A protein has these predicted regions:
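S-adenosyl-L-methionine-dependent methyltransferase catalytic core, i.e., the SAM/SAH-binding region
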Residues: 1-249
Length: 249
């Protein structure tokens, strides 16, 4: 199970007290949410957000088993954290502003290891990479399969270079183009093998412990889930919902 890091430190930075309303913008397995619920007490509320329905279900089950007394203090919301302003306004907490907002950015190990998400080159699965309930996204949204099989060489090269900082992006794209001529690239392992065969670990001084597909997969995950745009919108909207002396951590 994923272990929440810097738990006490993060909660401390928010400077919360009993009765406060606080947002955990990245619920995950609920580690931070539990700590926040403990701090704000019976009269406080924690608005816990996650766009992954699986994460919400698992966090609820964990809290029911381990901290049932906190359930009434937590409001679970399935949504993108970029919509934090609308979420806070629509939860009936009587609070237009909140005392604190906490965001623990990154992927849970459970998501990375789950084939349904198609996130990892260590687990063979369909190229997906959607964070939203392993593919519960609008029908017209692109997943990693769409990008790898339909984007132009120039667009792929730019994606890998800019979002993955992959210095072998041109070589990798040439290999992808050649593979696409034979058949669609459908799985994570197919793509990882194409990348590894095209560049291996050559020239990666100081990077020998990472798989050669790491940076490409990073770029795809960021693109598929609009991570940079979502983060920018979230930061802007988080400031809107904070009290005058509220904190974002």
């Amino acid at each position: 199970m994923h272990k929440t890091v810097l738990l006490a430190e993060s909660a401390f930075q928010l400077n919360l007290k009993k009765g406060d309303v606080v947002v955990d913008a990245t619920l995950g397995m609920g580690g931070h949410t539990i700590e926040l619920a403990k701090i704000v007490g019976e009269k406080g509320r924690v608005i816990a957000i996650d766009m992954d329905a699986v994460a919400i279900r698992e966090a609820k089950n964990r809290i029911k088993k381990e901290h049932k007394e906190f359930l009434d203090r937590i409001i679970f919301v399935k949504d993108n954290f970029k919509n934090i302003d609308k979420i806070v306004a629509g939860q009936g907490t009587s609070a237009i502003k909140v005392k604190g907002v906490l965001a623990d950015l990154g992927w849970r190990i459970e998501q990375i290891n789950d084939p349904a998400y198609g996130l990892s080159f260590n687990v063979d699965a369909r190229l997906n990479m959607r964070l939203d309930e392993a593919g519960d996204s609008p029908e017209d949204s692109e997943d990693a399969f769409d990008i790898i099989n339909s984007w132009s060489a120039d667009d792929l090269e730019r994606l890998f270079r800019e979002l993955g900082e992959e210095r072998f992006s041109k070589r990798i794209v040439i290999a992808i183009k050649e593979a696409r001529k034979e058949k669609e690239i459908k799985t994570t392992m197919e793509l990882a093998n194409i990348i590894e065969e095209s560049v291996g670990h050559r020239g990666r001084k100081g990077e020998r412990k990472i798989h050669p597909a790491t940076k490409v997969f990073q770029a795809l995950r960021i693109q598929v889930n609009s991570e940079l745009n979502n983060l920018n919108v979230f930061l802007e909207n988080a400031l809107k919902v904070l009290e005058k002396d509220g904190r974002l951590a």
